Amino acid sequence: MTSLAVIVPSRGRPQNIKDLIESFENTKATCDLWVVCDEDDPTLDQYKALNLDHLLIYERTQKGMARPLNLAAREIFALGKYKYFGFLGDDHRPRSMYWDIDWTIVLDQGVGLVYGNDLLQGENLPTAVAMHGTIVQELDGMVPDHLLHLYLDNFWKTLGLDIGALTYLPETIIEHMHPLAGKAQVDQGYVDVNAPEVYDADKIVFDKYINSDAYRELVRRLM
């Protein structure tokens, strides 16, 4: 039985999930893949046609991945089945064999976060990440409430550094097939979450939370 659940929010990109499944198979991943979709996604039937082992569907109330990621993390955590929780975008592609084992080996050492090399941000930002279940429990999710999309990786890096438990694995490749890397076309999903108003809103929420008593208490409990 795997100890790692990897959550992948996705909208309008069923082909990406198909490609991601192939990447999991090619790298001999044994973690459980949980795909999260919006109930109003016009391509929802195509996701269902993939016959995924784990598909969660939620009402969409805002743009971005933060809300569906947190809803899924809470629901999956409540199952009591997993020790560790990961996030991949639907535009990430694991390339290293047994990459998920690399993650769990680190997390077996204690409460913390781990990420690999996405060949775009590298060590700079954990665009794909895994964390100990204790973090999910204490945070009641994987990111602070009210974030939308763009500052999720900033939060993970900040939290990992502040609790002294952030591990970067440069040889564990989880390629980010992003337009900024010239590896994908800009679609409506990218347009929506990279809009200036989303960036501005996320920065305000991020800065406020990182400087809050709630965040300082979170760090204290995790150390």
What are these regions (language model features)?
Residues 97-113:
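Conserved donor-nucleotide/metal-binding helix-loop-beta segment in metal-dependent transferases, i.e.
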Residues 112-127:
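Short beta-strand-to-loop element that shapes/binds the nucleotide-sugar donor at the catalytic cleft/hinge
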Residues 154-223:
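C-terminal catalytic/acceptor-binding lobe
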